[in-house]
Amino acid sequence: MIKNFLLKVYIYLKKKYIGFELVDKNKINTEIKNSNYNYDNLLNLIIYKNKIFKKKNIKQNNNKYKIFKDIFINKKLIKILDVGGGGGHKFYEFSKIFKKIFFWYNLETLSLVKLLKKKFPNEKNIKHINNLRNLRNKIDIILCDSSFQYIEKQKKFLDDLIALNSKYFYLSRTFMNHIDNDQLCVMQQTLLSENGPGKIDNYMKDQIISYPCYIYSSSKFKKQLSKNYKLIKFSIDNDDFIIINRQKYFCHEYLYKKK
């Protein structure tokens, strides 16, 4: 328990005060780049959290759902692409809150997709995929919730998402470079227990894990989206940030609608 406490203190200080140093993304080896949701401890944690989350009671008056109420109000079947959706917990979350029929594509790493299909072979209306070629339906809304910042080739990936021609595009909890047009890269450190939906107090096997985090230019992001989409909501969370070379980069939220 003392070790876990010290790890939490270190990560807190690292995030809020010390910060991270810029790294050259070309010098990050392939093994580290592919580590996200690709090694056993993290995979098993995601599965464990997913089982807990399915049993969790969701508060229907939660403010974070208000943004979707108008989008879903006149639709019975809603097709969603959840980019980096972990174990697919948002599918269960949305189904409980909105009482709609969802068909859910959960885009994740190949290792996690294989494990999810093995552990939950009889899931209905949710399909775990590891690339966009597996999409079989036109998408109503694309969700990128704290996932875009872990994509290395962000411009190309964003272009691929835009090409899907979804009616809505929603990005949230994503660090953005509001200062210039550069893509920044750091080796982000987090606690293992912080990954996936929610946190587990006193997690017995907690440890520090590291993986690349890419901070995309907010101006480039808006320019790419503006060709096909109209911005209908934007906010910055001043309490959620990453420090890189003593500069804060805040989490952004965007909701776009197809023109």
Regions found by a protein language model. Give the residues of each.
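N-terminal accessory regions of S-adenosyl-L-methionine
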Residues: 1-79, 88, 183-259
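Class I SAM-dependent methyltransferase SAM/SAH-binding core
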Residues: 85-125
